[in-house]
Amino acid sequence: GVACLCDSDGPNVRGNTLSGTIWLAGCPSGWHNCKAHGPTIGWCCKQ
């Protein structure tokens, strides 16, 4: 999957670990949405 920046990772992508994964159809079972705003396409989810 494509990595994304969770709210808990920090304010921007530079120098931070991207712990989320982008899911286009929503977070799968057992995962949660970890970013309050965005991404533009899909959801940023983590286990």
From Swiss-Prot:
Q: Cite the Gene3D superfamilies for this sequence.
A: Anthopleurin-A
**Alphabetical list of SUPFAM superfamilies matching this protein:** Defensin-like
**Pfam families per UniProt:** Toxin_4 (PF00706)
UniProt keyword terms in alphabetical order = Cardiotoxin, Disulfide bond, Ion channel impairing toxin, Nematocyst, Neurotoxin, Secreted, Toxin, Voltage-gated sodium channel impairing toxin
Q: Which GO terms describe its molecular function?
A: sodium channel regulator activity; toxin activity
Q: Which InterPro entries match?
A: Anenome_toxin, Myo_ane_neurotoxin_sf
Q: Which family does it belong to?
A: Belongs to the sea anemone sodium channel inhibitory toxin family. Type I subfamily.
Under which name does UniProt file this protein? Delta-actitoxin-Afv1a
The organism's lineage? Eukaryota, Metazoa, Cnidaria, Anthozoa, Hexacorallia
